[in-house]
Amino acid sequence: MADSRDEPLVLGIETSCDETGVGIVRGTTLLADAIASSVDEHARFGGVVPEVASRAHLEAMVPTIQRALKEAGVSAKDLDGIAVTAGPGLAGALLVGVSAAKAYAYALGKPLYGVNHLASHICVDQLEHGPLPEPTMALLVSGGHSSLLLSTDITSDVRPMGATIDDAAGEAFDKIARVLNLGFPGGPVIDRYAREGDPKAIAFPRGLTGPRDPAYDFSFSGLKTAVARWIEAKRAAGEEVPVRDVSASFQEAVVDVLTRKAVRACKDEGVDHLMIGGGVAANSRLRALAQERCEAAGIRLRVPRPKLCTDNGAMVAALGAEMVARGRAASDWDLSADSSLPVTDPHVPGRAHTHAHTHGHDHVHEVSKENLYS
């Protein structure tokens, strides 16, 4: 077995939405996962406000990097690379992270790796369950994405199988939570109420499940509208809305479609491993139904612990470490944020394949043990 010190030591920065995440990994071992969330600042607006998120990232970036280095017990000088989410995500939020990573990598004389947010959500599973089997089918569900992806090489070959044609699953959870006056974010609170409700109480529609519908695409807009109208009709009639039953029935409609299509994709492609990631993967019913259906189909299910399902820097560091380990080219210094970066680009390599440490200057200045560059 190789010495763990030979495994890449990588720091990852995540700012695609409202979490400022900084993670540090050595190979597939998680050393630090520091997060500063601005979710409370967005709650009063009922959703993420891009400008608020960007400003929060600016304020949290340096303290979060410092916290991660301290938690990991490593020196910045010993890092083998800096990875950062280059997209997709909110443009302004991404720009804060990319700018910070570029400055930090250049100052340290370390290679920079701009990586894909969705590919990072897949790769984070390695920190919990070891190397990803190749190929692996991945179901990624969050407030911004609902995608089925086939990964044969997480650093270079990720193929989209299906995606939502309208709203993401997480967005639907947030919307229904608002209609039920349960607050933001909606996923955790719906999950909580649903545990005490009857998932068969109300027959809500399952989008794109007909014989002529796309096999792997999702649609949650119709479901969202149907649930909202059902609630409004109850209120208009002066009747009490059964919040727990509505939550359970709505949640069941979402996870039924997600798991059904994911298992079908595995069967059709002959893939015996399914990984589920993204914020909605923390949902207890999604995990339970996926396990049940995967066992019945002879498919191995891999789901990271809930904290690693939501946005974090550890997942970015994990993918960055994989890039280093496989000898992938570092990004150029003109790396920019791309809010619509396709998942077919797991990372953004440099045109000339130049690494940070070849620029010929020593920019490492140790000021104190708390200094970012020490």
Swiss-Prot record:
Cofactor: Fe(2+)
Domain of life where this protein originates: Bacteria
InterPro entries: ATPase_NBD, Gcp-like_dom, KAE1/TsaD, Peptidase_M22_CS, TsaD
A single Gene Ontology CC term: cytoplasm
Enzyme class: transferase
Chief subcellular location: cytoplasm
Binding site for substrate: 140-144, 174, 187, 191, 283
Gene3D superfamilies the UniProt entry points to: 3.30.420.40
Subcellular location: Cytoplasm
UniProt cross-references to SUPFAM superfamilies, sorted A to Z: Actin-like ATPase domain
Cofactor comment text: Binds 1 Fe(2+) ion per subunit.
EC number: 2.3.1.234
Record key words, sorted: Acyltransferase, Cytoplasm, Iron, Metal-binding, Transferase, tRNA processing
Positions with biased composition (Basic and acidic residues): 359-374
Residues covered by region (Disordered): 347-374
Reactions accelerated catalytically: L-threonylcarbamoyladenylate + adenosine(37) in tRNA = N(6)-L-threonylcarbamoyladenosine(37) in tRNA + AMP + H(+)
GO biological process: tRNA threonylcarbamoyladenosine modification
PANTHER family: TRNA N6-ADENOSINE THREONYLCARBAMOYLTRANSFERASE, TRNA N6-ADENOSINE THREONYLCARBAMOYLTRANSFERASE, MITOCHONDRIAL
NCBIfam families cross-referenced by the UniProt entry: gcp_kae1 (TIGR00329), T6A_TsaD_YgjD (TIGR03723)
Protein purpose: Required for the formation of a threonylcarbamoyl group on adenosine at position 37 (t(6)A37) in tRNAs that read codons beginning with adenine. Is involved in the transfer of the threonylcarbamoyl moiety of threonylcarbamoyl-AMP (TC-AMP) to the N6 group of A37, together with TsaE and TsaB. TsaD likely plays a direct catalytic role in this reaction.
Family: Belongs to the KAE1 / TsaD family.
Name used for this protein in its record: tRNA N6-adenosine threonylcarbamoyltransferase
Gene: tsaD
